[in-house]
């Protein structure tokens, strides 16, 4: 935190246009402890909504991948709760892989069930929601189906399913997998757990020989398309890895719950701003390179669309190739 304050204060000539002054370490510490994370969460929601409106016309804009990523915390965060695997927090995200657009559902303790957070989010009509077996909640599945939306997930091992009808197999080969079976199923039990919606089970075999059963309420897509939708879920794992590597959310500036949540939301706000800037200025660079250049040129006046190019030389100022006080070398 002292290094952050020192680096900021070293750029004092740029503070005027930001309406800021010098920064003290105690100011950062107080803000981390007292500033409400809800303000940052709302700001990120507005930015993500703006990105969503810009990409609404895309063909793949209606695919939503839902997952959570662990945020392990050290021994100094003795307030953090454990779920048996790690102690810390979890960040729950809805991800549109077509335009790399994430939305933060919530940041919770590690012991909060994923399904509890997933069903609290709004269901988008016509969207396809892809998630793993941790989001198993029949009431939420009914709400998705009632909204005219679809889900693709994996059934739990203790979920009793009976085959109602075998569907004919058309194309079987997908990218990295082969379809083994396509069946319409129903719950074997007749208790409260029975779902009053049509279900379909698609069994696929990956190239490594592992077999995976998928459960969906989508009866229109082909079995290969259903398998490809679930395979796309791994794109959110790549997003989590990218965020942790490049947005400074492995180490935190504070040890209290409030400060850590603020830093997580601030990182997501930075991600959304960078995506908006790259899209608005038609940046052709790879996104990671663009992020690195923005960090390098943060306190310089540069055109975002040409951030990789050196600034133009002032034509009104005569340039000197040498200075009279410059040391010269004379070769005999």
Roles of regions detected by a PLM:
Residues 1, 32-35, 42, 58-62, ...:
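Single, function-defining residue in the core of a domain
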